[in-house]
């Protein structure tokens, strides 16, 4: 699916959910890491690149102080919560990844009001492709855009990291978010986790007669509840 096809699909789904069009749609890709597993929180180096699968977030403001969240992958499982009631533990489940970003933005001092948010996560879940970070980055970008908040890529990454660490409870580093936000077509990024400096690195393996293969091991993992936190 192209990005354009993904946007069109989300527009249709948002219309069915809330009636009318969203104010904005943002998307963010999953990633594969060539070198540097578990180096982000150890001040090491990493070399990730983005993949074609993306997460989408469609947003429209509302004036009643409520956050309504829906997922294309989980129909009839909408979650609505008052902004003032959002805190770690409320809500839980898939909606925590959306509400956590909104909470992180408000905790950072940004004026974020009520919204309808529809997400479409097309990065395979629990497969090591950073599905949650792609979703959080898309929600962060859409949230700041619709509220007129100026935010650089690294600012969005920090909002996503705060949501992941302090709201969802997954003790990750920031490599995945930075990869999702900084990677460009035909490149990996060289990430120095000591300074968070990012350098674009050409990755044209096809010109050398090679191909990168990403294989599904069918081993599910969960940063919040698996062994990741224990290893860290």
Residue ranges and their predicted role:
Residues 149-232:
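ATP-dependent small-molecule kinase catalytic core of the GHMP/sugar-kinase superfamily
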Residues 29, 42, 50-54:
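Short connector loops at helix/strand junctions that flank enzyme active sites
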Residues 2-25, 53-159:
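Anion-binding (especially nucleotide phosphate/pyrophosphate-binding) glycine-rich loop
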Residues 44, 125-129, 222-226:
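A generic structural signal for short coil/turn motifs at secondary-structure boundaries
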Residues 43-50, 229-232:
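Short Gly/aromatic-enriched secondary-structure transition segments
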Residues 37-42, 162:
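Short Pro/Gly-enriched beta-strand edge/turn motifs at strand-loop
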Residues 24-28, 80, 211-216:
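Short amphipathic
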